[in-house]
Amino acid sequence: MNWISVKDHLPTENGDYLVTIDGFDMYRYIKSVSWTNDLSKLNEWVFPAEEYKGVGGFYDFDGEFGDYEVSYVVAWCKAEPYEGE
């Protein structure tokens, strides 16, 4: 698994990723999220086309609040499927 800094580049393919996030409590943590190359196609109510058309971003879903953009990402890597037993 190779971590890539968001300063170097962002994903180019829609899909699931692991990200390292700078937390508000001065700690970094890892979270499983998704990436899309166009947030407006994901949910135009939350991500209106006027502001988000063609804009990529990491996002997640919350059962109470719905889709939301994941901020403060410092690094990412592709989430690979389990190849175990």
Label each region the model flagged.
Residues N2-E85:
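Secondary-structure transition motif
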